[in-house]
Amino acid sequence: MANLHALRREQRAQGPATIMAIGTATPPNLYEQSTFPDFYFRVTNSDDKQELKKKFRRMCEKTMVKKRYLHLTEEILKERPKLCSYKEASFDDRQDIVVEEIPRLAKEAAEKAIKEWGRPKSEITHLVFCSISGIDMPGADYRLATLLGLPLTVNRLMIYSQACHMGAAMLRIAKDLAENNRGARVLVVACEITVLSFRGPNEGDFEALAGQAGFGDGAGAVVVGADPLEGIEKPIYEIAAAMQETVAESQGAVGGHLRAFGWTFYFLNQLPAIIADNLGRSLERALAPLGVREWNDVFWVAHPGNWAIIDAIEAKLQLSPDKLSTARHVFTEYGNMQSATVYFVMDELRKRSAVEGRSTTGDGLQWGVLLGFGPGLSIETVVLRSMPL
């Protein structure tokens, strides 16, 4: 038994998990929000629905999104017209696209992260990958590992159909992997392409219209590991703690169903209030052990589900406007990219901190929180410690 205890100690890292590199990627097709209603109603052959188009234009303006990147183009939609219907059975057409394109876009983000990390791909020991779409066997994790040329010994984990909170949740998983496997280097990748949720407009389906107005495509990747090699690996953040909380009796707040016509989503109008009203408890649980009880004393890397959610959090927790400014900026420039979004926010924060001459990667502060919100209702809270700049 003594030998077993010694072996277990030897298997563990000495220090905390750190985020060593960040990479992001989007499809090349940029859509300005101001002209998106014209594009959307044209490609879905819905220009006869002028009143609905006016309503959709107001919805697009209200999102506060300025532009988004999408895989779908007018050419692709002409080749696959079923995608433009409201609820015509079209799963096979959609699946044919995402099975190929999700790993490809993920590869772009992963390669950027690996390049910043500065070590050979052969030294990646674990791959954790999530996407709401593209369920297949072998999965997108296998396809990505093959595209990247990762070693056959890499330990893969694929997570499907989990949505917006999963970017934060994967950091919780990566922390445990890195700290319990000495020398582990975990490539964490989130990639979301909205092909399975794109569809034509319908007067009675507000949720579907809201999705067309706010969702974007993107991929984010990070490399996580403990005990960084001096002079080679340069941590950006330490992962001090990570935890999940499910809000009681909230399964109807937000979610989705996979059908023959793709993904259909639902959400309550009260969703921003539900998140804001319950977030304080999660923050208390995460930050109290550090002696932090003032939410303005930490930096924020929050998933911006929509503008109303950001507003509700800011008001309920009495945050100064700068705390969620990075989340607002990313949402404005990219829309809601579901699980990948939080990696864009984290990347933007560390870059902004450097450009503005802050003393740390966390806007000059030592401690911060990375937050994800998703179906469940699930609240993911990751405590980050910034690094000096």
From Swiss-Prot:
InterPro entries: Chalcone/stilbene_synt_C, Chalcone/stilbene_synt_N, Polyketide_synthase_type-III, Thiolase-like
Mutagenesis / variant outcome for changing residue 211 to F/W: Strong reduction in enzyme activity
Annotated pathway: Secondary metabolite biosynthesis; flavonoid biosynthesis
Enzyme nomenclature, EC number: 2.3.1.217
Keywords: Acyltransferase, Flavonoid biosynthesis, Transferase
Catalytic activity: (E)-feruloylacetyl-CoA + (E)-feruloyl-CoA + H2O = curcumin + CO2 + 2 CoA
Mutagenesis / variant outcome for changing residue 303 to A/Q: Strong reduction in enzyme activity
Catalytic residue list: 164
Highest rank taxon of the organism: Eukaryota
Activity sensitivity to pH: Optimum pH is 9.0.
GO molecular function, one term: acyltransferase activity, transferring groups other than amino-acyl groups
Family recorded in the similarity comment: Belongs to the thiolase-like superfamily. Chalcone/stilbene synthases family.
Binding partners and assembly: Homodimer.
Stated name of the protein: Curcumin synthase 1
Organism: Curcuma longa
